């Protein structure tokens, strides 16, 4: 089970809802992924305008836990305003904090992410901050009392996979809250690797919505995350420089 604050989920795949070709493909991809947590940008949908197409009208909101994010925020105050807007609309008070500090790389602003997380915790939100793979920043966020850490594998939407597995492993080793790898996942192999490192979950969007067949990719991601978790729990063999025979040599007779 993936436990985030008071919530428990069977699936360790969290799925973003943006950039799908249409609602039908989106819904089918969500279904086959078996994701229980869906994330979306509050600023990308007018949740108070009944005339606008609305994801919330298409989904069975009782079936999923919706995770609004603060994408578009440039500082802590903007992030808090977006979070309060989501809560006022009747959504869950679980929020993904996303405060971008650089428009080219879309990397998070560490100072504003810390500030926003602290402010939202004081407001009673369940806080999941998107952060870089900075080990010290992850620890400071954890010390604030956030409910999960969401380090990026690589820049958002890049599909580069995990570019710094060492830092990611350090974050996982020191964590006392769930670590959900977020951003940069490009393939099922990337997702499996994140889970093999010991991550508690993976959040992805573009890898599915941008695939040639989003529905098949959603299923592939589901299976790879399950396989990666099983592999982590099973425990991989140690890496060694020299070969070790897999068949015993003792007792074998030599035919001359």
Curated annotation (Swiss-Prot):
Under the heading CDD domains, the entry gives: ThiG
Q: Where in the cell is it found?
A: Cytoplasm
BP GO terms, sorted: thiamine diphosphate biosynthetic process
Which domain of life does this protein belong to?
A: Bacteria
Instruction: List the Gene Ontology MF annotations in alphabetical order.
Output: thiazole synthase activity
Q: Major place of localization?
A: cytoplasm
Q: Give the matching Gene3D superfamilies.
A: Aldolase class I
Alphabetized, the UniProt keywords read: Cytoplasm, Schiff base, Thiamine biosynthesis, Transferase
- Pathway(s) this gene product operates in, as recorded in its UniProt entry: Cofactor biosynthesis; thiamine diphosphate biosynthesis
Q: Name the SUPFAM superfamilies on file.
A: ThiG-like
Q: What class of enzyme is it?
A: transferase
Annotated transmembrane regions: none
Positions of the catalytic residues: 96
The catalytic activity of this protein is classed by the Enzyme Commission as 2.8.1.10
- Which reactions is this enzyme annotated as catalysing? [ThiS sulfur-carrier protein]-C-terminal-Gly-aminoethanethioate + 2-iminoacetate + 1-deoxy-D-xylulose 5-phosphate = [ThiS sulfur-carrier protein]-C-terminal Gly-Gly + 2-[(2R,5Z)-2-carboxy-4-methylthiazol-5(2H)-ylidene]ethyl phosphate + 2 H2O + H(+)
Could you give one GO CC term from the UniProt record? cytoplasm
Q: Quote the record's binding site residues for 1-deoxy-D-xylulose 5-phosphate.
A: 157, 183-184, 205-206
InterPro entries from the UniProt entry = Aldolase_TIM, Thiazole_synthase_ThiG, ThiG
- Family designation: Belongs to the ThiG family.
Subunit notes for this chain? Answer: Homotetramer. Forms heterodimers with either ThiH or ThiS.
Q: What does this protein do?
A: Catalyzes the rearrangement of 1-deoxy-D-xylulose 5-phosphate (DXP) to produce the thiazole phosphate moiety of thiamine. Sulfur is provided by the thiocarboxylate moiety of the carrier protein ThiS. In vitro, sulfur can be provided by H(2)S.
Name of the featured protein: Thiazole synthase
Q: Which organism is it from?
A: Bacillus anthracis
